[in-house]
């Protein structure tokens, strides 16, 4: 299983200073998870005092990160 990051997510992660490791950790071990639109999932995790939300979907055996944001608690 590979994790790929969409171009949109790459831009958002760079702008919001979310590392790939933080995004992958959020997906692998979320504090909370919920269904989203179009068969996507939202994973939430608090890391370094920030609540990170990663939206992702499955494409075959791969996981594709659609976007990542910092949420207010």
Regions of interest found by a model, annotated:
Residues 1-73:
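Ribonuclease/tRNase effector modules and their secretory precursors
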């Amino acid at each position: 299983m590979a994790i790929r990051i969409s171009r949109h997510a790459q831009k958002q992660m760079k702008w919001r200073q979310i590392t790939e490791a933080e995004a992958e950790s959020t997906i692998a071990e979320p504090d909370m998870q919920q269904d989203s639109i179009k068969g996507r999932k939202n994973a939430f995790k608090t890391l370094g005092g920030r609540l990170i939300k990663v939206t992702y979907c499955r494409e075959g055996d791969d996981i594709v990160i659609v976007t990542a944001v910092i949420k207010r608690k």
